A protein has these predicted regions:
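Nucleotide-activated chemistry modules centered on ATP-dependent adenylation/adenylyltransferase
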Residues: 2-298
């Protein structure tokens, strides 16, 4: 009787274990959260747009958007603020992705803004800080009311304070007193005329999460994210790529180094890191061992 009782009890326990819901992994939880955010925005807003530069965060964001609405096409336009100082490999990648998935891309040009007198060229040649005006002009012209960005809270203090839904006023300004509480997965997209909401589906991701997701999903990236030989020069402790923007200067000398980029942006302020990481797995090992954030390192 005792043996029979134990056998029956064990069978019941095994049956419960077999039907118990499986716990999601860290990546599965982050993916589900991001997909929910994309669908929430599609339901709340009229003209959402995805900022797409060809950088790894925007690439992952687009991949998640495609998953969120598959097999239907992505219901959002893409927007890229082109500084005119972008890495050629990244621009080629951007155009290839847009063509492959038959997406609509709007390009806001910093050079056009300079020519129109909306912004002035900086003495140091950097155009990274000049992107705000053409971005806001594009948002106004196309009446975008939600703007997806690839910002993550682990990148820097300025981004750590952002909510997932970040309300911006008519001038694109962020006011902490006007931000709404975000309880669980409830998001408030209410906004007034001329205002818009920045949306950050990757807020809770880390750089390592992004790379592990890239590895899991087999996502292709621009080649400059992996180790390659490149002409660079040293300025303020960073390896910068020479270009029409104004480098190198004075005693700065160009040399060839094996480098890769942890983040991509304006060539004038995006530094490379010396690296031998040729594959996604190599990059994951490198990032896991790093004690500097990508912003701090580059």
């Amino acid at each position: 009787m005792w043996v029979a009782h134990m056998t029956t009890e064990t069978t019941v326990i095994d049956a419960r274990a077999a039907t118990a819901p499986r716990r999601l992994t860290q990546l599965e939880t982050l993916e589900a959260e991001a997909i929910h955010i994309f669908r929430e925005v599609a339901g709340e807003f009229e003209r959402p747009v995805v900022l797409f530069s060809g950088g790894k965060d925007s690439v992952v964001m687009l991949h998640l958007a495609r998953k969120a609405f598959w097999p239907a096409p992505v219901p959002f336009t893409l927007l890229h603020v082109d500084t005119g100082h972008n890495f050629p490999e990244v621009i080629d990648y951007r155009d290839a992705v847009v063509a492959a998935h038959r997406l609509r891309l709007v390009v806001a040009s910093v050079q056009d803004a300079i020519d129109a007198g909306s912004v002035r060229e900086r003495p140091d040649g950097s155009r990274n800080a000049l992107q705000t005006v053409p971005l806001l002009e594009a948002i106004t012209t196309h009446r975008f009311d939600a703007v997806f960005g690839g910002g993550r809270r682990d990148e820097e203090k300025a981004r750590a304070k952002e909510r997932v839904f970040s309300l911006r006023d008519e001038l694109g300004q962020w006011d902490p007193r006007r931000q709404r509480p975000e309880l669980w997965d409830l998001y408030n997209g209410r906004h007034g005329p001329g205002e818009h909401v920045r949306v950050f589906p990757l807020s809770n991701w880390t750089e390592l999460d992004v790379w592990r997701y890239i590895e899991r999903e087999g996502i292709d990236l621009p080649t400059i994210y992996y180790a390659h030989e490149r002409q660079v020069f040293l300025r303020d402790g960073m390896w910068l790529a020479p270009g029409d923007w104004g480098g190198p200067r004075g005693a700065e000398t160009v040399e060839r180094r094996i480098v890769r980029y942890r983040t991509v942006g304006d060539m004038s302020c995006t530094g490379a890191v010396e690296s031998e990481a040729l594959t996604v797995d190599d990059v994951i090992v490198e990032v896991a061992a790093s004690r500097l954030t990508e912003r701090g390192a580059t």
